[in-house]
Regions:
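N-terminal Rossmann-like NAD(P)+-binding domain of SDR-like oxidoreductases, especially those catalyzing
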Residues: 1-179, 259
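Generic structural signal for conserved hydrophobic packing positions in ordered secondary structure
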Residues: 39, 89, 193, 206-209
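A general structural signal for well-ordered alpha-helical segments in protein cores
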Residues: 104, 157, 190-191, 249, ...
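Amphipathic alpha-helical segment in the mid-to-C-terminal domain
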Residues: 148, 186-187, 218, 249
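Heptad-repeat alpha-helical coiled-coil signaling segments
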Residues: 178, 184, 211-213
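Structured loop/turn residues at secondary-structure junctions
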Residues: 182-185, 244
Length: 270
């Protein structure tokens, strides 16, 4: 497979949970990595120190000029920067469209105008599919987003494909399911369960524990991202990232309780 040694790679949202793992894997390949992050949720201490091939720039994808400047001379773009927390999208819908849709358009258009960008990997979300009409959910599953977050991400996907058709924009759309691993924090489901268990919560309050999720470890999600960036045949395609194995939230609680060696009870929804 293609080597990314000395490849100029931009990671928007590179100080986040998934982005920082991408930074580590790409630096291990010898790539020249630029992180572009506003540090609203990403952390500088997630990133390695003292690596001469790592450049960190504080900036926001809603700032078109800043995006143009940072995209210049890049060869690969991994676009992860987003507002990701679904409940917030119900209260701040305009902000979600400003960042997830308009901000993404800034990244896409800057790449189109660049003379050096070979591939943009846009990290979308499985949330755009809505409730499963069948399982496993494949790339042909109908899109039926139920949150402003999901709609804002789907709008960015559609914009990316329009640019691909009209301008030859070299984009790959990846739709991860539930990614977990180090630096994954509350209030997302796995750290939320672990947090409640370790705090000694008498009855874990998790909502509907009969719902199911497909979980992928963060290093595997990032490997898929890097593979997509290297594969020219992936350009213009949608690719789901998941394990094709689902687990009930209630069963997940049982597994985590056994690992922690702490007995737990679950508060049932009335």
């Amino acid at each position: 497979m293609t080597s990314f040694r000395d490849k100029a790679i931009l990671i928007t949202g590179g100080a986040g949970f998934i982005g920082s793992e991408a930074v580590n894997q790409l630096l291990n390949e010898g790539a020249k990595v630029t992180v572009f992050d506003n540090f609203s949720s990403g952390k500088k201490h997630y990133l390695p120190k003292g690596n001469k091939k790592l450049r960190i720039i504080k900036g926001d994808i809603t700032n078109e000029r800043a995006v143009i400047n940072v995209t210049k001379d890049q060869e690969i773009v991994l676009h992860l920067a987003a507002l990701p927390f679904i409940p917030d999208s119900f209260y701040y819908p305009v902000d979600f469209f400003k960042v997830n849709t308009i901000g993404s358009m800034h990244v896409f258009w800057s790449a189109v105008k660049s003379k050096t960008v070979e591939t943009v990997v846009n990290i979308s979300t499985s949330e755009i599919y809505g409730s499963a009409q069948y399982t496993p959910m494949d790339e042909n599953h109908p899109t039926s987003p139920y949150s402003t977050y999901a709609v804002s991400k789907l709008a960015a996907d559609r914009a990316a494909f329009t640019l691909h058709k009209e301008n030859g924009f070299p984009v790959v759309i990846l739709r991860p399911f539930n990614t977990f691993g180090p630096r994954y924090t509350e209030p997302y489901i796995i750290p939320e369960i672990i947090g409640q268990i370790l705090r000694g919560t008498k009855e874990l309050n998790l909502g509907n524990v009969n719902s199911t999720r497909d979980f992928t470890f963060v290093s595997d999600t990032v490997k898929a991202m890097i593979s997509a960036a290297k594969e020219k045949k992936a350009i213009g395609e949608i690719i789901n990232i998941g394990s094709q194995n689902e687990i009930r939230i209630g069963d997940l609680v049982t597994k985590l309780s056994k690992i922690a060696k702490i007995k737990t009870k679950i508060k049932r929804d009335e």
